[in-house]
């Protein structure tokens, strides 16, 4: 009989999506993506997730969240249905990172997890998380040295549509040419090539300020779309935050037992 593997349930909660990871303790073995819906109840989320994977295999839960109302629902699912106390990334959790910002407590859980995921790499790293907001996290010697936050693609589209009379809502696609020839392709160019140019430009400015070379990793929901448009050399890892969350869980698991 094939042995059933125990799994760690990982949640990366963003303002637009909830990325769910299942881990064997070493690797991310499966991922799922749900919409972030603050009006949905814990029971509704549980029913939705129960259709995706077998809850009986879950032995631990870890949550990285920037949406407090969703955090509470996931805690309720963990405690009510799984009878497990989840690990929440936040104050008091051992991350292994130094955070050299004016107020380290205001650095989001997603940024912490992304930084932890690359902390062991020898070179300085710039993580670009293309989510609801675009975050640039500069890490060196297991230390976050600085962060940049800009509006994400969806926020930019909503701002255009919501603050103009004639611009329509659009699907996020890369147009065939940079110079658009109709309203939709013009807007699509702005939010795709525009973000790629922002990434390239900030890479150059960070290099000028730090006066050192560094590696760049793109992650987040739109990284697959934007990465090919960037001119600088970079890599892409869509599971970076989940990998960092898994490392934080393993780092704290022995302390919780």
Task: Cite the ranges covered by each PLM segment.
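Conserved active-site and cofactor/substrate-binding residues in soluble primary-metabolism enzymes
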Residues: 40, 44, 69, 106-113, ...
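Phosphate-binding/catalytic loop of phosphoryl-transfer enzymes
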Residues: 84-88, 93-164, 193-202, 234, ...
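Adenine-nucleotide phosphate-binding core of ATP-dependent small-molecule kinases
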Residues: 32-36, 175-215, 222, 233-235
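Gly/Thr-rich phosphate-binding beta-strand-loop-beta motif of the actin/hexokinase/Hsp70
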Residues: 2-29, 118, 123-142, 160, ...
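N-terminal glycine/serine-rich phosphate-binding loop of ATP-dependent small-molecule kinases
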Residues: 1-9, 13-95
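Short Gly/Thr/Asp-enriched flexible loops that form oxyanion-binding sites at enzyme active sites
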Residues: 73-79, 136-146, 229
